[in-house]
């Protein structure tokens, strides 16, 4: 009795549909899908600069250390 069977979940689903209606549930589903899509797009833009940082660190290793000379005499 610790877990719910499929019949318990179906009864809960019917009650939720009666309380909220199918139109509101559809709107909630669309909003949730849009939020997930926005999160995935945000993660893609976050990962792109990381690749650019790796490329710039590879070029930074090719720099040469020099000493500056005093040009003011």
Curated annotation (Swiss-Prot):
Membrane topology, as annotated, equals: Single-pass membrane protein
> Among the entry's GO cellular component annotations, what is one?
TAT protein transport complex
One Pfam family from the record: TatA_B_E
A biological process from GO = protein transport by the Tat complex
Q: Where is the composition biased (Basic and acidic residues)?
A: 62-73
Q: What is its main location?
A: membrane
Q: Where, by residue number, does the polypeptide cross the bilayer?
A: 1-21
Q: How does it assemble?
A: The Tat system comprises two distinct complexes: a TatABC complex, containing multiple copies of TatA, TatB and TatC subunits, and a separate TatA complex, containing only TatA subunits. Substrates initially bind to the TatABC complex, which probably triggers association of the separate TatA complex to form the active translocon.
Q: What is this protein called?
A: Sec-independent protein translocase protein TatA
């Amino acid at each position: 009795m610790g877990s719910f069977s499929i019949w318990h979940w179906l009864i809960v689903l019917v009650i939720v549909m009666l309380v909220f209606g199918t139109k509101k549930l559809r709107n909630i589903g669309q909003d949730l899908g849009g939020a997930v899509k926005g999160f995935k797009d945000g993660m893609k833009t976050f990962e792109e600069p990381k690749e650019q940082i790796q490329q710039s660190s590879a070029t930074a290793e090719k720099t040469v250390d020099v000493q500056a000379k005093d040009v003011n005499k």
